[in-house]
Structures are given as C-alpha cells and as structure tokens.
Amino acid sequence: MNKLSHSVLWIVTVLVTAFNIQPKQEPIEEVIDRGLKASTEQALLMAKELETQNGRLPKTINKEGKLETSDYSWWCSGFFPGELWYLYEYNPTPEMKKYAEMYTDRVEEVKHITYSHDVGFMLYCSYGNGYRLTGKPEYKDVMLTGANSLATRYDERVGAIRSWDFNKKIWQFPVIIDNMMNLEFFSWASKASGDDRFRKMAISHADKTMLHHFRDDYSCYHVVSYDTITGMPHKKQTHQGAADESAWARGQAWALYGFTMMYRET
C-alpha cells in the first residue's frame, strides 16, 4: 500500500471515529422544555421569597450575595410579572397564575407616573401580558390610564416623547434610543381605545428618531437632545456607552427591536 493510500485510510479512520464518539444531539424541543422547566422552578422560588413583602419586586443580587428589591417605580419593575405571565402561558397552573396576578398588582401605581418614559416597559410587560392571557377588563383600564400618563411626555414641537427630566442644564429635551421600546405600548393603546392619537405619537417619535439618532454606518447615538423651540437636535451624546461617538450595544438592540416592531405595526 503506497503512502497516499495510507494517508487516505488514516483520514477516513479518524473521521469515522470522531463521528461515532460525538454526543447524540438532543432535539431542540427538549432543550427548550428543560430550560422552561428550570425557569419555572426558579421563578416560583423568587415569587415565594417576596410573597409576604408587600409591594416589593426582585431587582438584583448584590456583591454580598443578598437579594435587593425595588418598588413599582424602578424602570424594570414590570419585567418579573411579565416573566411570570410568560411562564404561565407555557404551563398554565393555578399557582403560577396566582403569583403572576400578585406581582402584576404590585406595579399598578405605574399608571399614574408622568415623570418617566419607561411606563411602556413597566405596564406592557406586566399588565399587557396579563391582559393578553386573561382578558381581564381591569388590566386594560390600568394600561389605558398609563398610556394617557405617558402621552403627557410627548411634545408637538419636537414630535417625540421626552425621556428624562434630569440634567436640565445640559439637555433641553433628551430622547434616548431606549424610548423606541415604549412605542409598542402606544400602538396597543390606539387599537384598544380607538384613539389614533397614540399611534400618531408613536409614528412621529419613530420618524424623528430615525432621522436624528443614526450615523452613516447605522450605529446610533444614545441621547439626542432637542431644542424645544426649533424642534431640532442641539446635542448628541451618550449617558451609558463608552463615548459619545461609540455604539452602545444595548442601545443598538433597543433600536433593532423598536424599528422592527414599528414596521410591523405600520
């Protein structure tokens, strides 16, 4: 047998051996199911941990390994109730529904918040999923009240929803890319109420953001502040990224979701 034949035989032997020792591929459905079961167990443990702490919601684990909590006013307050509703959708048990309703109730006061653009995050994740899965009319009422609260942050001269109220010496009317995530709430509110005002505000905000937040390479600024008289940008900066001209990864994700969603809705 010549050298070429030896080489070919060696390569074939290695490939056959490697193929035979590869672990059996687990069907993706089983991987997903296992992950959701683990998520359900962990979510229920968390829900029970804070069950007797009225009004409290999970926030983070600090460096000492202790659980930190928040009240309804934290911008992520609606995420845990939303998680419980998604897990209830996966496995609709009475226990999961009980906790989803309990933690959703803890963010009800968000409906009166007029100092933050995150009302969409906070209510649509929690009450939005609760309403989608149960059809409870009181959930719809909370969200429509919240939509009207959020609408107070829209300025006709700028054509967008104001994000923050701090740093007024630096920003006149700051709009952050994150705000695209709240437009889905307005889209729902228009359909649920028949009031086209919400939809028009969402479209105007998206158009304004598309026009002024993006660079030539389609990376986006974190903060664009508008002149409240002319409605035009006067500052383009970052508040959480590495630098004003950098592309903040989380902001890029907000933009991808927000504009994909607005394309779907329009």
Question: Where are the predicted features?
Answer:
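Bacterial Sec-dependent N-terminal signal peptides
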Residues: 1-27
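Glycan-recognition and catalytic cores of secretory/periplasmic carbohydrate-active enzymes
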Residues: 24-266
